[in-house]
Amino acid sequence: GKESVAVTVNTQIFSTLMRVTGDGDPQPSLAESYQQLDDTSWEFTIRQGVKFHDGTEMTVEDVRYSLDRAIASSYVNYVVSFIKDVEITGDNTIVIHTNEPYVPILNNLSIPFTAIVPKAYVEENGDEYFAQHPIGTGPYKMVEWNPGESIKLEAFDEYFGGTPKTKNLVMKVVPEAAQRVIAMETGEADIAYSIN
């Protein structure tokens, strides 16, 4: 449904500290590495040279801001409620302190709600503007959005994971399942959600 499409779009625009492989194993993404310091402290070394879609470089300040923003959000804080605080310990290191030992921390830090956002851009423009004009560090940047109709994404050449092979992604809202089937059969669509 709508949620799966929103998650698909978000995972193209944004990146998280961790990602989960097809086997369900957490792997570093925007984090270069991590280590558990004790039962309630996890250190993350942040990947250097990562760019947001506006060309600015991601910093540990953006990471702390993004996690603090998620904690403060009544909509998504359940994903990060285990976090006591985020401490910047170096130019590219942070320590996440948890309220108590929390085993699924790495998985939770791969959930799209924990995406790293550009602090200065969000603070300057506000949450409402950011929701309509998002920029992240993901493989695609949003170039056009027609609410209720379509979203057009374009490959981000400076993506830290390498330039995506597909140049453009267009996601269209097609309310009728039968129309989605026809779009697949005629080749108008490459992927369709909720066909049955």
Annotate each predicted stretch with a short phrase.
Residues 1, 5, 32, 41-44, ...:
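Short, well-ordered beta-strand elements
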Residues 1-38, 68, 135:
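N-terminal lobe/hinge region of extracytoplasmic solute-binding protein
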Residues 12, 29-31, 37-41, 58, ...:
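Extracytoplasmic
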Residues 18, 22, 39, 51, ...:
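Sec-exported extracytoplasmic/periplasmic mature domains
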Residues 21, 25, 111-164, 168:
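Gly/Pro-rich hinge or "lid" segments in bacterial periplasmic/extracellular proteins
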Residues 32-74, 89, 95, 183:
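Aromatic- and charge-enriched surface segment that lines or borders ligand/interaction sites
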Residues 35, 78-121:
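Surface-exposed binding/hinge segments that line
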Residues 156-196:
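Ligand-site clamp/hinge motif
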